[in-house]
Amino acid sequence: MESFIIEGGHPLQGTITPQGAKNEALQVICTTILTDEPVRITNVPDILDVNNLIKLLQEIGVKVTRNSRHDYTFQSDELKLDYLDSLEFVKKCSSLRGSVLMFGPLLGRFGKATIAKPGGDKIGRRRLDTHFLGFKYLGANFVHDEERNVYQIQAKKLKGCYMLLDEASVTGTANIIMAAVLAKGTTTIYNAACEPYIQQLCHLLNAMGAQISGIASNLLTIVGVEKLHGAEHRILPDMIEVGSFIGMAAMCGAGIRIKDVSVKDLGIIPDAFRRLGVKVKVEGDDLFIPEQKHYVIDSFIDGTIMTLADAPWPGLTPDLLSVLLVVATQARGSVLFHQKMFESRLFFVDKLIDMGAQIILCDPHRAVVVGHDHKLKLRPGRMTIPDIRAGIALLIAAMSANGTSRIANIAQIDRGYEDIEQRLNQLGAKITRVSD
């Protein structure tokens, strides 16, 4: 187990480029199961969750060629399907939530899948019902083997149909799409997630020979095809990392440029920071965040307290609420954060309160932050990271604090952020990785 030692109070300045999007990578890498031809994917982030998924694919026989650090070629022409039943595979799947994205491709191409109940962040209940209901609509049968804690899913031949999803689940939509592209007939998915990650997934599948229309909307139409072929695909910059860097620049920056962010795919993210008073300038495909000596939280027209809430795309991603909350601790004014999609992602605020932040945790979904307006710096502290997004938020808090902090369980940060301490140290941070 490793920790970060952070010497806070050092201004960050310079240029930083976001990694490839973690959530997109997990999806598009799994599409390679759908064809026996090579699929090349570039801008793959070198992070724990993605690397673990690639290892899982290798275990079932996917041939993986690493052309360079962020460039891979995958070929699934000799898969070892019997390995899916092994205890070793079940154990490996149980620690990685991204493994759930193997369900759809395996079911679509081979008509069966046996996958462990996946792991991931401990951020409350994260249902798989949407995935299973979608597969059931397509004609699959599934059984939960409680003794081994695995899901056994089978279908002789999936058949297209109309389905209305009960929630716009991103991974659920992705899984259903990957199952449906090889199904017989036409599948219509209403209330589909439409995040840029889903759009990218659909574009890759179409390049592989799928017939998907309605991309970027919540109504997708998929005409099943007999076979998919190889293709090439480049992963988008990670919008969550872009938002994290905006937060760092607001709290600790003396002028930071975030390069090649794909502005058109950021949606409401820059405006969410602007509502906290943070200056975010768009310059070409870059974002520039100047030094923020003060930033003032907006209020609604009727004068009531500003509320920031997560919502399905094109709403605000829940993955950035933790970062926005930390930024608000040094703003002028008050803001209510409403975390609707997960019921325990706000529980990390007790660590910020220990650092001197003024936060009222109303319930598991809501917290009110009263900003210090940079008049009272956060205190350093010792803390343990509960999940990826809380981890990066606490790292930002520690960098802005006066003094030295220690953050444990940084493997959570490594799951989603590539070489984070090295990249931030190049901007002027003082972060050291140590073994516990």
Explain the meaning of each model-derived region.
Residues 1-436:
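Short, structured segments at the rim of ligand-binding sites
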